[in-house]
């Protein structure tokens, strides 16, 4: 998709993770005239814009009636900004962060490899305010992909693997007795078209459909 828009891709080894991509970006900025690095893991404008826009939209659409927010942590900007706004409106709102179970850095564990692109950077981003988070929920690769596929088949939502992880976490929260009949807000940040060539969708067995099957 990026190449279709004329972009030149500079790929880094998968084993280097996000840190490898950040390091290459810094090297490119140093060598390319007039280059600018957004630094989304460090730029305070990241959580600020979510506090001013995303969170306000959530509050207005819900008419102030929500009990919990569940979101994956990539840069940490979305969950930090939204949590700050929502907790100012209602301190009783609980905020749940989602991270890969094989890279439980937010839970105090060690970074590791995983297949949930978009979250689990392997370090705690500078823009992430852990004081806003009430609980961290760990989701494994299979859970994220399974729920992501179900979202497409059962709900008509073609979303990415990090969205699958967020909904998987929301289901766990919703199954807790204290959240029965409560309103949970889940942020789905990824669209599925970016994942059609990944294991998440290529593992779906092809099933031929007859033309008159739905007539």
Question: What kind of feature is each model-predicted range?
Answer:
Residues 1-68, 98-152:
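Small/polar-residue-rich loop-to-helix segments that shape phosphate-bearing ligand pockets
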Residues 168-215:
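Phosphate-binding loop/pocket of nucleotide- and phosphate-handling active sites
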Residues 3-4, 81-90, 168-178:
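Alpha-helix C-terminal capping segments
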Residues 71-79, 162-166, 184:
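Ser/Thr-glycine-rich phosphate-binding loops at phosphate-binding pockets of nucleotides
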Residues 39-40, 72-74, 97-99, 185-190:
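Short beta-strand segments
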Residues 8, 92-94, 183:
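Residues at the starts of beta-strands that form the adenosine-phosphate
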Residues 49-93:
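Glycine-rich ThDP/TPP pyrophosphate-binding loop and its adjacent helix/strand module
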Residues 131-180:
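Active-site-adjacent helical/loop segments in soluble small-molecule enzymes
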């Amino acid at each position: 998709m990026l190449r279709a828009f004329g972009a030149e891709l500079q790929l880094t080894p998968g084993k280097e993770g996000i840190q490898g991509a950040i390091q290459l970006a810094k090297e490119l900025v140093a060598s390319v005239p007039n280059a600018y690095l957004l630094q989304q893991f460090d730029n305070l404008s990241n959580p600020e814009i979510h506090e001013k826009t995303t969170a306000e939209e959530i509050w207005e659409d819900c008419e102030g009636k929500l009990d919990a927010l569940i979101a994956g942590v990539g840069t940490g900007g979305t969950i930090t900004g939204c949590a700050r706004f929502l907790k100012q409106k209602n301190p009783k709102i609980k905020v749940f962060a989602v991270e890969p179970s094989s890279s439980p850095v937010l839970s105090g564990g060690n970074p590791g490899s995983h297949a949930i692109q978009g979250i689990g950077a392997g370090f705690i981003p500078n823009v992430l305010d852990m004081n806003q988070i009430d609980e961290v929920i760990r989701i494994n690769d299979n859970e994220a992909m399974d729920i992501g596929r179900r979202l497409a088949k059962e709900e008509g939502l073609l979303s990415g693997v990090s969205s699958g992880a967020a909904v998987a976490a929301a289901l766990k929260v919703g199954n807790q007795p204290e959240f029965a009949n409560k309103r949970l807000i889940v942020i789905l940040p990824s669209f599925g078209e970016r994942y059609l060539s990944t294991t998440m969708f290529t593992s779906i067995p092809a099933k031929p459909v007859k033309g008159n099957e739905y007539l």
